[in-house]
Design a protein with these regions (language model features):
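N-terminal lobe of the biotin/lipoate ligase/transferase fold
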Residues: 1-116, 121-122, 147, 172-173, ...
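Residues at secondary-structure transition points
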Residues: 36-39, 71, 132, 143, ...
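Short, charged/polar low-complexity linear motifs in solvent-exposed/disordered segments
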Residues: 45-46, 88-90, 141-142, 167, ...
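Catalytic-loop motifs flanking and including active-site residues across diverse enzymes
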Residues: 67, 134, 178
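Catalytic cores of processing enzymes, dominated by hydrolases/peptidases
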Residues: 117-163, 167-170
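C-terminal accessory segment of soluble enzyme catalytic cores
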Residues: 147-213
Length: 213
């Protein structure tokens, strides 16, 4: 779906699009990811109910799963100005502003890419830009099962600790609550007027549309 939307955004057939979702348990390896960064065998992965996918974003290996807000902004940077670095920094600021709504003090300066609470990573970012249009995006730990990170060398950093909004606050936070806080900040940071559509509306426009070569 991402690839098809990216083609349509690049061709001016679709407006910039933001996909927000939760994944089932999955480990994804970016272009710099290594199979050795996954520390368990296939039998253990099956017990965990987790799949492994090699994808074309930047970065190494990370985990996605229930309780995590994953966002795929598919944006034409050529229309909005700024390159990939500015885009990533704007994503970081958007996530930091979102976390501040809940009283979580986060930062990104002088750190590896992503968003951090002290020495603990709370959000990961991995993107790709093709024909000036972004794909992939970010993953914000709202209230996932953080033990899934124990089975990988997350983001290529063996000693990195992960955290979540719920762990930092000491109570449950829902992904829906995180989305409600994130959307206004995303619109403000990127200068968008946002309109929400149901997933079926996005899918129905893609069903019979041939993918451009």
């Amino acid at each position: 779906m991402q690839r098809r939307i990216q083609q349509e955004v690049a061709g001016g057939e679709r407006p910039d699009t933001l996909l927000l979702l939760e994944h089932p348990h999955v480990y994804t390896l970016g272009r710099r990811g290594r199979d050795s960064d996954i520390l368990v065998d296939e039998a253990r992965l099956a017990e965990l109910g987790a799949e492994v996918h090699h994808i074309d974003r930047g970065g190494e290996v990370t985990y996605h799963g229930p309780g995590q807000l994953v966002g795929y902004p598919i944006i034409n940077l050529l229309r909005h100005g700024g390159g990939p670095l500015k885009y990533v920094r704007t994503l970081e600021r958007t996530l930091i502003a979102t976390l501040s709504e809940f009283g979580v003090k986060a930062e990104s300066e002088d750190r590896p890419t992503g968003v951090w609470v002290g020495e603990r990573k709370i959000a990961s970012i991995g993107v790709k830009v093709n024909r000036g249009v972004t794909t992939h995006g970010f993953a914000l730990n709202v209230d996932p099962d953080l033990t899934y990170f124990d089975h990988i060398i997350a983001c290529g950093m063996p000693d990195v600790a992960t955290t979540s909004m719920s762990r930092e606050l000491g109570h449950h936070v829902s992904v829906d609550d995180a989305i409600a806080a994130f959307m206004p900040h995303f619109g403000r940071m990127f200068g968008f007027e946002l309109s929400q559509v149901e997933p079926t509306s996005v899918q129905s426009t893609l069903i019979d549309t041939p993918l451009p070569e």
